[in-house]
């Protein structure tokens, strides 16, 4: 063929003639047929770029491989270490992380992050800003290196105080650095250019705050400081996230335009910033180890798109996005999928044609369209068509059960046949290799045209433009089929035809992260996260940028369903939902059609507000559930929902430990006790009531002493301290109704009963019956003395009423303030325990105090239609509150404050308790003026009455008073001498001698009994003298013991007995011991009423043992003759420290302790 003939060849002939036979070569460039036509120089002139490198290459003006490698490596490393790591894992984690961020302990990688964004948006960071950022980053490198070195040393040697102090010091320096220098990475005007630097620095800061929460207690941080650091972790997570999302959107918006080249840059920015910024911030919630204390299967379901498979040349005219390219909007709407559920490719059928240039010697295959079959996690399938799929040959690739972890593509710009004219006018995809893995087996599926002159057997596996150049693996230390970071999940396509000039057929590959699990496995040992896009029957909308994937939206009452595969059906789980909503309602969960959870949710944002980080919240379901089937369906639904949208980020399935209920009780108790105190922990919050403290104490007592002995002791001390604070501020005398109708207590009518053991009250409550008749009401009252009051001060009466009808409450000072309370008896006690009597047979006796409820297995249900009023606390109709104000305080007048309860009706009743009268604070403003007016009016009325009384006396109209002598009633008590043991021994010896003289010869029969008794007395004497506790028999009152209120020594039947009459009473003594000896703790005591009494012994190493006494318990370590008698219990201990502490307390009722002995064992 001569030159003239060649000039008549159609350079662009598209052929689908199956009869054309074209010889094939596997490696076309080894023996290019063009060389037989042209000399080398001619070939280079006409096909100047006809070599492997230029058939398809990366965009020449951006090289972000180093930055992307580091960003993907950071994300992959964090995903692998979520939860609370053990020491070795934490060291490995930081080593891997710093390998990506600080290779060679310098800032080179961070400079790459800056260059990456500069190239993406074609702007430059000023030298001043760059130099300052690099300087601060070098400081970060130095500080974080010192911290991690100290941390590693401490993890290996936690017992060394110097090492501990060093790591804490280094952490504080590093934390201060972050707090001070983070603004340097967000300089005004350069926020987008510094965005990747800011993101990675923020990530490190949050990781360091996570360390402080995990290890803070061991470093010596106070609980308050640990909580403050946790609060900062949450606050900075929101702050850093909102910053990153805001400036990501700003940078992306700046790249919007109308042409294809702008879209090319736009898509690259979106992809690379997703990898470097959005993926990182999506993991921030997982740093909260309160929420994620165990490994978590976190999934990034977002999709990223690699570059269009189109030729990129050396000149603008050689690029696919040059002349006759689709518009920006056309590319975006055609190539980028709308929000959808997660899917993966099952089959891909590619249709191809051939392009003839330079006759049959330049024939190439050309991808012109495809049919893609996708499957979802719900096993549903969908088929979509792209491009031209009729009248063309095709190749079908089956990817069932395979992950496509890499592609190698051959895009080509085909030039016309014309000497010296090398501008391509036809852009095609000539061949693609799909690299797959299934289990450990790898394979390569190939698309190619058998009619292709040079690639009739496909593209060699080592050639092409590889997807890993844009989506590198998580690590280079492992093979790509193991360490790959992304899977191919979809292929879109766009075609532009303009005759035979500048026509383009362009596929686009869509990828999801390798963390996505298509089978929805539910793991028994880690938290399973199911994003909203892993379900079906769910509406999917675009994510706000920080979730890690698109989110769900309710469709009416329907939120979606999830098909899951449960590894262990015997394991219990609980659910947690991350959501945002503008309304309130109930969220329910079904498993295989049965409702297992139904909880109320609260609104998280106002209508119209954007979906920010703080707009999302968690709804945690505490009730554990089981799956009945290995393959199950979870359904989420809404109930009682008003208008508004419910957004669903995802559902989390959390394995429940075998001791989950106990752990939940511990957390509830911690929360309840913490809520009682101000931030300083030394005072009660002003709105905390005595009833709330009692309920918190009930929660503490339900904590498992076997699992959480230390925590229980600490919380019990805290709640007792709260009770002491409550009692110290309570101006009422005898609020527990222990001494009604006695001095300094309440005065009550005979129809008032004191009740104990009511499930609603921890202490005693009072019951008022109806009036006997209209002249004899039921009443209860007391006066608070003037000496305890302050001038111009507001006081508040508070309490808890189980129910009342026609109950009048009076607060009296300047006249009577009267309120009638009618509170429904609508509190239902739900007992979840089996109704058994634990004392049906105890030594053949029964006891009414044993038939009691278990506070740890009860809940209180309140009717939802209960009316609330202005004098109720937090809208609870059963918690009441009334106030009264004082004016001037005059001890001579001694007005005081009278508190009275009265029922005058024949159909009245009331049960109430936890009464308290507390000081609220000084009066001011209108309240002050009002009490001054009231006091002045009262004084005028009083003066007038006194004047009238004086006139009456002077006129002789007053009745004569009869003075009768006062009769004093003196009770005589028989005083019984409390002999010591040696006195008892002497008395016994004398009596035995008299018995021997007077009863001989029968006395010999009792001699053995006498000797046995004498030996026992002698041994008891030895025990008494060897008791290392001071005043263990309470002969000297409570000397040597630390005591609180409601604990006193009484003389009962001639013995000194320690009596605890309230659950907050505490008696304790610390003693020195020898840690190379064993000791016997022996306690003689008895319990009356409900609840338990206990004697706890603990050492400085937090080893705790407890002897428990109950009115209905008979244990193996107990010696007793009858149920109500004193029992003696013993316990052997072997302390590890040189000091131990004995603590005596009770849960409720009365506890009597006759003696406490701690005796050292002899070898």
Swiss-Prot record:
InterPro entries the UniProt entry points to: Cry1Ac-like_dom-VII, Cry_V, Galactose-bd-like_sf, Pest_crys, Pest_crys_dom-III, Pest_crys_dom_I, Pest_crys_N_sf, Pest_cryst_cen_dom_sf
Cysteine-cysteine disulfides: none
An individual GO BP term: symbiont-mediated killing of host cell
Pfam families linked: Cry1Ac_D5, Cry1Ac_dom-VII, Endotoxin_C, Endotoxin_M, Endotoxin_N
Keyword ATP-binding: no
GO molecular function: signaling receptor binding; toxin activity
Alphabetical UniProt keywords: Sporulation, Toxin, Virulence
Signal peptide feature range: none
Misc: Toxic segment of the protein is located in the N-terminus.
Functional summary from the UniProt entry: Promotes colloidosmotic lysis by binding to the midgut epithelial cells of insects.
PANTHER family, per database record: ENDOTOXIN_N DOMAIN-CONTAINING PROTEIN-RELATED, PESTICIDAL CRYSTAL PROTEIN N-TERMINAL DOMAIN-CONTAINING PROTEIN
Family: Belongs to the delta endotoxin family.
Official protein name in the record: Pesticidal crystal protein Cry26Aa
Organism whose genome encodes this protein: Bacillus thuringiensis subsp. finitimus
Gene, per the UniProt record: cry26Aa
